[in-house]
Amino acid sequence: YPKKVIIFSPHPDDDVISMGGTFHRLCEQHHDVHVAYETSGNIAVGDEEVIRYCEYLRDVCAKYTEDETVKKKAEEIIHFLRYEKVEGEAEKRDVLFMKGTIRREEARAGARYSGIKSDDHIHFLDLPFYETGLVKKNDLSEADIAIVKKLLTDVKPDEMFVAGDLADPHGTHRVCLNAVLAAIDELKDEEW
């Protein structure tokens, strides 16, 4: 005591949905808590949310900077979402970036509220299997497992909490669980 803990969250909200009270209690008891968001969760963000944030960004930039780069990018994204987007096609990288950024900031706020004091205890893994821009995801790969292994060897946790809803309709929770289990299996002979 205190213990070093990693909470693995498949999406940037599963940590507080699945174990928010425990998360808060671990921090309250002064354990060294890390949270690892395995995917960006970007496709769960609606287009209207992106438009709202882009309008905010555009207006702030117009007020406080003469550089037009960010303002123009925000306007480009707004125009695309309102007039050009074709349902069923993969999202544009800029839109995915905005959606992922919205989820990251929501996750950071939730982690801080739960008691994490330092941003270096909040990890965004962005596992590659998820980043297709579509509901359908890629299969788990060695690249995904390597990212989880690196976090485990960097943090060297005493305890881990892993969300693994095997009934997840899109399979993301299952794939994320399998990434952690595969990484643990590959590291089982390591000592820390």
What role is predicted for each listed range?
Residues 1-12, 16-191:
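Active-site beta-strand->loop->alpha-helix modules in alpha/beta enzyme cores, enriched
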